[in-house]
Amino acid sequence: MSNYRVEKYTKENRLAWDTFISGAKNATFLFARDFMEYHSDRFTDYSLLVYKDDLLYAVLPANIVGDKLYSHKGLTYGSLVLSKSAKLLYTFEAFKALLAFLDAKAISSLELRNIPTFYNTMPSDELSYFLFKANATLIKRDALMVIDTSTKIKFQKNRREGINKAKRNGLTIAVEHNFEGFWNEILIPNLQKKHGVAPVHSLEE
């Protein structure tokens, strides 16, 4: 029977982490350590590595707030990241080992934001199934849309009319390298009005 071990990420794991992410079936550049550590001053990292028979089998990008673990509040999404050779039964055991680790560390809850499936390089619905089996609570669901650029999309008539109207009224589109006007007059007021938040990044960033 396989042995599973969970460890908290340290800087000594950086190369192993990034190498694993580059070959995973459900990961993007957001999970690379350079990107994750960009906001290291705002989040307490508590990323986890899961080993199967001493080989890295899965990783969980995560941060901790009190006794609650999130995957990951500094990223658009998080997930249990798996290698391309991952098998359902082994992944189930790895996930159980991860939950047991959190319980042993007195972590009261785990909140996950699954990576959208269109980013996966291979089918990878294991985590959704495990969350169902664990009777997890769904607290939010986002609507996502993707454009398949290999398929021609019909142009709606009202869109064409909008373009023609813009041309008649002298609307022009130009490349602009000064973002200050957009930042202060459009982005900040709209984020505040619609969502009650400020931009995550500063204009300088």
Region locations from a protein language model:
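A conserved beta-strand-loop-helix scaffold within acyl/acetyltransferase catalytic domains
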Residues: 3-53, 57-68, 114-142, 146-205
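Acyl-donor binding region in acyl/amide transferases
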Residues: 67-135
